């Protein structure tokens, strides 16, 4: 599965599935390591997306283009 094709929500869902499989399926060491590596890549991807989104929000707020409360 190509992690770059997954959006943030699908990546989180996949991470939940990986954690569940490691906790409940009792995989052998090689399978557990592969799942761990896949999860680490998904985490990296999610963090990058969160940081990118945070920067966009900061730009919007600092530009004054957004009013949070209109009276």
From Swiss-Prot:
Its main location: cytoplasm. It catalyses: Exonucleolytic cleavage in either 5'- to 3'- or 3'- to 5'-direction to yield nucleoside 5'-phosphates. InterPro entries: Exonuc_VII_S, Exonuc_VII_ssu_sf. Keywords: Cytoplasm, Exonuclease, Hydrolase, Nuclease. The keyword Heme does not apply. One of its GO terms (biological process) is DNA catabolic process. One of its GO terms (molecular function) is exodeoxyribonuclease VII activity. Coiled coil: none annotated. Bidirectionally degrades single-stranded DNA into large acid-insoluble oligonucleotides, which are then degraded further into small acid-soluble oligonucleotides. HAMAP family: Exonuc_7_S. PANTHER family: EXODEOXYRIBONUCLEASE 7 SMALL SUBUNIT. This is Exodeoxyribonuclease 7 small subunit.
């Amino acid at each position: 599965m190509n992690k770059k094709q997954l959006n943030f929500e699908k990546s989180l869902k996949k991470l939940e599935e990986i954690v569940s499989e490691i906790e409940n399926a009792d995989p052998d060491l090689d399978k557990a390591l592969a799942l761990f590596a896949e999860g680490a890549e998904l985490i990296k991807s999610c963090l990058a997306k969160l940081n990118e989104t945070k920067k966009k929000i900061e730009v919007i707020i600092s530009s004054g283009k957004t009013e949070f409360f209109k009276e």
